[in-house]
Amino acid sequence: MDERELKIQFNSEIAEGDLNVRIAFYANIGFFIEIAQMLEFNLRKLICYHNSVTEIEKGEITKERIKKICEENDEYYFKTYKDKFTLGKLTKELKNLSILQSNVLDNFDEINEYRILVVHKIFQNNIVVNKFKDAKYVMEYTNQRLLPMIEKATAINKMVIKVIEAYKEDLHKYKNDVGIVVE
């Protein structure tokens, strides 16, 4: 195979007879999963920045104390990977912290439930009902379910990044105030 050739593998019975619809369906599933993974990554960061800043603000602001708090939250961050915290588990952590409003947290739940559907159930269910063979159905599903969830997940992720940036600015200010070099 030529190095410049691309090979795309998929189930040819999905959107049977319409290659463009099939490719769009698979591409959008992949993109949704990417966004959900980025949201999961950003929720880890949000929890750690929130915990660091709120803990710093509870007491005396000293170099040693800030270093200790940041180290503890760095450990927590790595623990979330080691213990395989999922989007659902991270959302539960956020609910316990009351960082965000409940309607925002509800969006995380919705995105997570849809992620579970896409990753674990959609193709299994299709074995029984076989709806995804019909290109028109696949196009409707993509336009009415998949693309709106991509848009929602993208918007929510952008909002989370803004909240992270606010916490990050506060944390960097506290670090600068006590002489900790911010990388």
Question: Can you say where each PLM-predicted feature lies in the sequence?
Answer:
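Long amphipathic alpha-helical segments
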Residues: 32, 48-53, 125-129, 151-183
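Flexible secondary-structure boundary motifs
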Residues: 51-106, 113, 117, 121-126
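Charge-enriched, short contiguous segments at helix-coil
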Residues: 95, 99-160
